[in-house]
A protein has these predicted regions:
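Hydrophobic positions on the alpha1 helix immediately C-terminal to the Walker A/P-loop
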Residues: 48
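Pre-Walker A (Motif I) flank of P-loop NTPase domains
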Residues: 30-34
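A glycine- and Lys/Arg-enriched "phosphate-lid" helix/loop adjacent to the NTP-binding pocket
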Residues: 127-199
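Hydrophobic anchor at the beta1->P-loop junction of P-loop NTPases
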Residues: 37
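NTP-dependent small-molecule kinase module
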Residues: 2-28, 51-53, 171-239
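Walker A (P-loop) phosphate-binding loop of P-loop NTPases
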Residues: 42
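ATP-dependent small-molecule kinase phosphotransfer cores
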Residues: 59-156
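Conserved lysine of the Walker
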Residues: 45
Length: 239
């Protein structure tokens, strides 16, 4: 099965496709682990993922760093559409485009990597869809949540074993996010939208306390990185 991941020990921020530290010379004997990162805008996911990947590499653990929406060539094309501020689509269309991207990403990238013994580190996954589309767009509407859950059950064959929810007050996250470059289609939403998104993540953490671990995203990047690494070590028994 084709995968767009290119084995490498060096993360290239400008690349739109997954970055992998997996070796071409040896296949791991066991299935890889699947970790997702979640959170509202400006919580520091990108830096936290970079730090985790450095720790995995230092421990000789092969990993593939990827993202959603995106992660495969086709999914990246859909990402461009979804994040373009000029895109004007209905909520249902947005939801279906997200799952189209996710299906391709999973089949072309995530599953092959896991089957090869590579750890997959994904910037956003299904929880973001529930939080952003189910709560940010639909204010927690049960019918919309049911629709999303149905799509997950139908098309998502592998959920993360561990989800790291980086939690920060919405106002603080938005203050950080506003210092970045031009906002994309989601980042341009109002504070109320992200307050609902935060509510969604909080509810998901209550629903799935074993899988979703809340990480305090305040403080220095070193502090946050240490909290994340301790959680990963405890979950996967890394010495």
């Amino acid at each position: 099965m084709h995968t767009s991941a290119t084995p490498s020990h060096t993360n290239t921020p400008s690349s739109n496709l997954p970055e992998s530290s997996a070796s071409n010379t040896e296949t791991a004997p066991t299935l890889g682990r699947f970790i997702s990162f979640e959170g509202t805008e400006g919580v520091g996911k990108t830096t936290a993922i970079e730090q985790l990947c450095l720790r995995l590499e230092a421990n000789g653990i092969p990993y593939l760093r990827t993202r959603e929406p995106g992660g495969s060539p086709f999914a990246e094309q859909l990402r461009d559409i979804l994040l373009d501020p000029a895109t004007d689509i209905e909520d249902d269309t947005e939801l279906l485009l997200l799952f189209a991207a996710r299906c391709d990403h999973m089949q072309q990238v995530i599953l092959p990597a896991l089957q090869n013994g590579t750890w997959v580190i994904c910037d956003r996954f299904t929880d973001s869809t529930i939080a952003y589309q189910g709560f940010g767009r639909a204010y927690g509407d049960e019918l919309v949540r049911g629709k999303i859950d149905m799509l997950i059950k139908q098309f998502v064959t592998q959920l993360p074993e561990l989800t790291l929810w980086l939690d920060l007050p919405v106002a603080e996250g938005m203050k950080r996010a506003n210092k970045r470059s031009a906002a994309d289609r989601f980042e341009q939403q109002a504070t109320e939208f992200f307050t609902w998104v935060h509510t969604g993540f909080s509810q998901l953490a209550s629903e799935y306390p074993e899988r979703i671990q809340r990480i305090d995203a305040s403080g220095s990047t070193d502090d946050v990185s240490a909290r994340i690494w301790q959680t990963v070590m405890d979950r996967f028994d890394i010495k």
